[in-house]
Amino acid sequence: MRAILLGSTGLVGSSALKILNECKEIDSIFTVSRRAPKVEGSKIDSVIEKDSDVWGDIIRKQKDNDVFISAFGTTKKLAGGNEGFLKIDYGINYDAAKAAKDAGVKTFVLVSSGAASSSSPFFYLKTKGKLEDDIVALKFPRTIIIRPGVLLGEREASHGFFESSLVKVASLVKNSVFAFPLYPAYDEEVAKAAIFTALEPLKSTEPEVVIVSGTEVNKTAKEYDAKYSGST
């Protein structure tokens, strides 16, 4: 199986690249990013391009890929507000999805957010939900949406006091009865859930939409370990 990965330098994307590189089911991984990924390997072909406006053209030229995984995203703080967040989180992802469809990708995997909804009163979740809806409307043979809860892991940049505090609380209650409704998950668990679901065979000749909710991420990650652990 051949894969394209967007967001290979981020928290979930870095883990996804490492796992894809170690998985014997994956023959090649293509990435495009503003800076070089930390993970290297003989199966990885990385293009460094600081101008994200041309990423779609680069992706469109990558033929014969089976899976596209987007773990690309930002926060309103890092994007400088709502307008920047919309341009980056929605705009770049949607352009990449259209390019992937043009390139003949069969399965598109989007790492989204828990409670994402285009009808949400909250801008962040509303934007995530609109992106989900518009990617589903592209009608890939299969669209997979991963909706993790609070994301745990070592971030390179601070995402603000509220989010940092939420992450600390979530890390303390993970694997306890108090985890609800945060559904915390580590970056590698989210990555494994995305990859496991992408590796499953298509079940229909009609466009298929698969949602992996926050309650299912950890379970699906364990399924990856059970089936593919040591798959190098």
Curated annotation (Swiss-Prot):
Membrane topology: Peripheral membrane protein
UniProt KW Transferase keyword: no
InterPro entries membership: Him1/Fmp52, NAD(P)-bd_dom_sf
Superkingdom classification of source: Eukaryota
GO BP: import into nucleus
Keyword set, alphabetical order: Membrane, Mitochondrion, Mitochondrion outer membrane, Transit peptide
Pfam entry (one): HIM1
A single cellular component GO annotation: mitochondrial outer membrane
Localisation: Mitochondrion outer membrane
Residue ranges crossing the lipid bilayer per the database entry: none
Alphabetical list of PANTHER family matching this protein: OXIDOREDUCTASE HTATIP2
Family of the protein in this entry: Belongs to the FMP52 family.
Protein name: Protein FMP52, mitochondrial
Organism, as annotated: Meyerozyma guilliermondii (strain ATCC 6260 / CBS 566 / DSM 6381 / JCM 1539 / NBRC 10279 / NRRL Y-324) (Yeast)
Gene: FMP52
